[in-house]
Regions:
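Protein kinase catalytic-loop region centered on the HRD/HxD motif
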Residues: 127-134
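Short beta-strand-loop-alpha-helix junction that forms the active-site gateway
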Residues: 66-71, 110, 158-159
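ATP-binding glycine-rich loop module of kinase domains
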Residues: 40-84
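Active-site beta-strand termini and strand-to-loop segments that position acidic
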Residues: 55-59, 108, 147
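Conserved structural core of kinase catalytic domains
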Residues: 67, 83-123
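Juxta-kinase regulatory segment immediately upstream of eukaryotic protein kinase catalytic domains
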Residues: 2-44
């Protein structure tokens, strides 16, 4: 049951998850293309990485669907870290709204971080996560956005490690 997704959407995701192992040895673009065909979701695809494909739900939120087993782990990691980290760190993490097996729904954030802000604030923010027992792996310009309040927000923290 989902507030954001229809039963058909969830069935489509489950179908993809049952077939994704067939594509484990393909390139990330081939895997993303195959998932898009099998998923047949009505949402616009806005991107993909090695482990997940991202769709715009057109309501201020995005849907991330796993492309690999590691993608499933990334979704679980984002859910766990968002719900178990300190509040002062949570304000720098993209909000998780809903999660299911192989998928996660998060707030859509699309304001790119200007280089001058990134250069000044990214390393201190990485240190803040590290000091709190969270290793911020893969935290770079492609995985951060600016909140409406001007705060750096990590939109992809599936590779973070919580100690």
């Amino acid at each position: 049951m989902s507030v954001f997704l229809s039963n058909w959407d969830i069935q489509s995701i489950n179908l993809w998850l049952s077939k994704m192992h067939h594509y484990k040895d393909t390139s990330k673009s081939q895997r993303a293309n195959e998932s898009y065909i099998i998923l047949q979701l009505t949402y616009q695809k806005i991107g993909n990485g090695r482990h997940r494909i991202v769709f715009d739900l057109n309501n201020g939120y995005v849907l991330k669907v796993a492309l690999t087993k590691k993608g499933i782990q990334c979704n679980e990691t984002e859910f766990k870290i968002y719900n178990h980290c300190r509040a002062d760190l949570r304000k720098h993490l993209c909000r998780v709204k809903e999660v299911g097996h192989g998928w996660i729904i998060m707030k859509k954030m699309d304001i790119k971080v200007p280089v001058e802000i990134s250069n000044k604030e990214l390393n201190p923010l990485k240190n803040k996560f590290s000091d709190a027992g969270i290793k911020p792996r893969d935290m770079g310009n492609s995985n951060i956005r600016l909140s409406k309040k001007g705060k750096i927000t990590v939109v992809d923290y599936g590779n973070f490690i919580m100690y």
